[in-house]
């Protein structure tokens, strides 16, 4: 696949725009769950397949961190995924996450973003 060797942090704006179109196609054509809200299942499945490109998304940490209401998250469809993905990409442009890579919890830059969100939530609950 064209997505296999891509890293979120390395994408140029043009590459990002192309990737988001490919991901939208996958979002709309992979039937991974019968639930109305596919964002969690989709992001976690794609993170497993494309760990350097996709940040895993969940309700408890990611939805809360971005302060999305349940209806926004539940019914926003691909727009919600695009919102998260765009914010994650922008974050990689602002911070050097490579410096935080290790062999334990921070195995890739997308997992570092996930860990930052979880850590923020745990510190502030």
Question: Which positions does each model-derived feature cover?
Answer:
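Helix N-terminus capping/helix-initiation residues
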Residues: 7-10, 44, 108, 114
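Helix-hairpin-helix/helix-loop-helix acidic hairpins
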Residues: 1-37
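Catalytic DNA-binding helix-loop module of base-excision-repair DNA glycosylases/AP lyases
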Residues: 25-66
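A general marker of short, structured functional hotspots
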Residues: 12, 21-23, 43, 77, ...
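C-terminal accessory module of base-excision DNA glycosylases/AP lyases that mediates lesion recognition
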Residues: 57-125
């Amino acid at each position: 696949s064209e997505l296999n060797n891509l890293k979120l942090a390395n994408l140029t704006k043009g590459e990002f725009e192309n990737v988001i179109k490919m991901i939208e196609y996958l979002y709309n054509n992979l039937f991974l769950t019968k639930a109305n809200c596919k964002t969690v299942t989709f992001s976690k499945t794609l993170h497993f397949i494309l760990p350097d490109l996709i940040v895993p998304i969940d309700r408890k940490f990611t939805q809360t961190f971005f302060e999305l209401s349940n209806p926004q998250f539940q019914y926003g469809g691909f727009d919600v995924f695009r919102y998260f993905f765009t914010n994650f990409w922008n974050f990689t442009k602002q911070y050097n996450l490579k410096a935080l890579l290790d062999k334990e919890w921070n195995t890739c830059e997308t997992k570092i973003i996930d860990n930052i969100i979880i850590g923020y939530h745990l510190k502030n609950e």
